[in-house]
Structure formats: structure tokens, C-alpha cells
Regions:
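Short beta-strand micro-motifs in enzyme catalytic cores
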Residues: 42-44, 71, 110-114
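A short acidic/small-residue loop/turn micro-motif
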Residues: 105-106, 129-131
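Short glycine-/small-residue motifs
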Residues: 123-126
Length: 131
């Protein structure tokens, strides 16, 4: 079993009400299928089904004072077709400022991605690349 180099991602959001449905649509498409947290509490999120140390966890914490910034979280997928498919999920789920899917040769020769923001304007990306 390979080790996940990240323990977790803890993204701040201004409002659970704004983003929960978006992440409930997006995260399972990226392999985060086990949900944590609930309607009450300070955080919510999902993990992959692997055991530790391979488990990946993406959480979000409600912080009404949070201000989105230029940081971006990028998710890697296996194929360009997955980028296309997840781009459609993002549109249906209420993603904002969607760019692509498209080739982005300014990053690398085979960089193919969709760039977008969640409903709280946090920057995200889904990318396929082989180098």
C-alpha cells in the first residue's frame, strides 16, 4: 500500500449552506466516497476508502470570516475523459468561473485541465497529465 503524502486538506468556507451540495456532487467523482461530519459541527468532509496510510481526506470547515485567495487545490485524474466528465459535474453542481476543459501547454506539454471555483469562490482544478 502506498502512503498518501498528505494527511488531509482542510479548506475554509464561509458557509456550509453555500458549498455542501457542491462538494457532495464533486468529491465522490474524485474518489472521496466516505463522508465525515454531519449537519451539526464545525467541519465536514470525505475520505477515500483506502486504509491508512493510503487514505486521502478532504475536509471543509465553516468560517464566516474566511476570504478566498489565489490558492488553488488541484486534483489529478487518470484520463482526459475524466477531466471532461468532472467538468460537467462541476457545471451541474454550481461551480463558478469555469475555464476549460482545455490543454494548458503553459504548464506542460500534456497538461489538460478544468479550472473553477466552488460556490464560495475557492479555486479548484481537475487535471490529467503524464509529465
Amino acid at each position: 500500500m502506498s502512503r498518501n503524502p498528505f494527511s488531509h486538506i482542510d479548506l475554509r468556507v464561509r458557509s456550509f449552506a453555500n458549498v455542501t451540495g457542491f462538494y457532495q456532487a464533486l468529491l465522490p467523482e474524485l474518489g472521496f466516497t466516505v463522508w465525515w461530519g454531519g449537519e451539526e459541527g464545525e467541519w465536514r468532509g470525505a475520505s477515500t476508502e483506502e486504509s491508512f496510510p493510503g487514505k486521502a481526506f478532504f475536509g471543509f470547515t465553516e468560517d464566516p470570516g474566511h476570504r478566498p485567495n489565489a490558492s488553488c487545490i488541484a486534483f489529478w485524474v487518470n484520463t482526459r475523459e475524466e477531466v471532461d466528465r468532472i467538468g460537467e459535474v462541476v457545471k451541474r453542481a454550481g461551480g463558478k468561473n469555469i475555464e476549460g476543459p482545455a490543454d494548458s501547454p503553459e504548464y506542460s506539454r500534456d497538461y489538460y485541465a478544468v479550472f473553477f471555483e466552488d460556490p464560495d469562490v475557492n479555486r479548484l482544478e481537475v487535471v490529467h497529465r503524464t509529465q
